[in-house]
Amino acid sequence: MKDVEAWTTLVSPSSSRDPRKLAERAQRLESDGWDGASLVDSQCLMGDAFAVLTLAAVSTSTLKLGTGTSNPVTRHPSVLANLAATVQVISGGRMSLGIGRGDSALAHIGARPATVATFDKVLSMLKSYLRNDGVPMSDSASMLAVGRPGLDGIAIANAPETSRLHWLPADLPPVEIEVAASGPKVIAAAARHADWISFSLGADEHRLQWAIDVAREEMDRAGREPGSVRFGAYLPLYPHVDVEFARELSRGIVTSHSRFAVMSNSITGPVSESQRTNLERVKSTYDMTKHGDAAGAHSKVLDDDYIDQFALVGDPDRCVERIERLVDIGIERFNFWTADLDGKAGESYGLAVESILPRVPNRGRSPATPSLD
């Protein structure tokens, strides 16, 4: 069995998004024993993700790093691959490119998520760029938003035959591609191209099992080996002795990730009637100006039972039991959203580090001694 990884985020909903603070947080996360940390890549809500990840890379030595998540629209695939590869080199091979169809990064510039067809094409191109295989010039040019495809009429006697990252060193593995997915079409695209598929379906093992089955069926159809794609999950993790407080901490993230299941105005995957009711409420009330914010009115529409199913909240032992069940069905990377490090929310973060992180099954490292700062 391959090692299970426990990641968290370089920002929590209430923490500072000042890039100068995030390198310090990366150091803290590394000392607390996390395997990796991801960063939101949304240009209107955060500083540049790759600049911050570079800063985090030179400030740490073992912490894996990734975007959570990039999108196929705001950067050309060659630019996105180049940025990820640069962090890969600087970090000594610790970079993972997390990507989805696009959400807040596009909504805040007045655009919708990329189509699944575009996303599929971009995944194929990213894979080629990151492995230093040539991308056909026609494919590369087709992704230019305002450029002028073709080289006719300009002074070039001998043009490159393909588009590639010529500078990539040969001594490092390619950047892993991790797709954030919730619906069957995106899961299938990821199964054809990605190294990891991380599901935004919460901690409901029945919905996650459905998603894994969709991925495995497409992998088989595409002729990919069973172990060539690994599975992860984006999960809110908010342990606390006061379960009501834990639910309140989780509401913003639970709501924003629940929305992914209804982004196209239809519910993806198997759901109970109660889950359907809550998802319909999210669909009709979501306020993008309060994205991920527990103070947003949209976060108040969720029932406690729904939050308890979607998130890992309350008793740490119960959280660990659920994590163990998810490992049993094939989840090997946990992308945990956790609370801020300080204040009362810090009590939840401390429990996550002290009472849950060391008990995540099959991790390939000894837990670190949590920081008491």
Regions found by a protein language model. Give the residues of each.
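N-terminal beta1-alpha1-beta2 module of alpha/beta enzyme domains
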Residues: 1-67, 175, 367-373
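Hydrophobic faces of well-ordered beta-strands that scaffold small-molecule active sites
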Residues: 4-10, 37-39, 65-68, 95-99, ...
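Active-site mouth loops of central-metabolism enzymes
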Residues: 4-20, 70-77, 171-182, 237-240, ...
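Acidic-and-aromatic substrate-binding clefts and catalytic sites of carbohydrate-active enzymes
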Residues: 14-18, 40-48, 72-78, 204-208, ...
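Short, acidic/polar
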Residues: 16-28, 83, 180-189, 316-325
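Structural motif
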Residues: 32, 90, 192-193, 329-331
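Conserved, mostly hydrophobic/aromatic
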Residues: 33, 56, 87, 190, ...
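An alpha-helical appendage that flanks or caps ligand/catalytic pockets
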Residues: 112-168, 208-328, 363-373
